[in-house]
Amino acid sequence: MPMWIKPEQYRVVGACLAAARRRAKLTQIQAAERLGRTQSFVSEIERGLRRVDVLEIILIARGLRANPLKLFAEIARSAGPA
C-alpha cells in the first residue's frame, strides 16, 4: 500500500467537495462567504491545487450543510482502491 499521496488524489477530493457545493446549489463565491474564505481558496481546493486536512474537510462540509461522514464516504469511494 503506497504511503504517499498523488496529485490526482487531491483532484478527487476537490471534485467531491465541488459536487457537494453544487448539491447545496451554491456558487464558489457563496461557499467562500459561508466559510469566511475567498473564492480563490474554494477554487484551488476544488481543482486539487490546495491540500486540505481532515478538520478542514469537516468545516467545509458543515459550511455547505453537508454531512461530513457522507462526504468522507464519497471521497473514499471516489479515491479507488488503496
Residue ranges and their predicted role:
Residues M1-R23:
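A short, Lys/Arg-rich alpha-helix, primarily the initiator
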Residues A15, K25-L26, V52-L55:
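Residue-level signal for the short linker/turn that defines the boundary of a DNA-recognition helix
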Residues A18, I29, I58:
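Residues within the helices of the helix-turn-helix
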Residues R22, E33, R62:
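Alpha-helical residues within the helix-turn-helix
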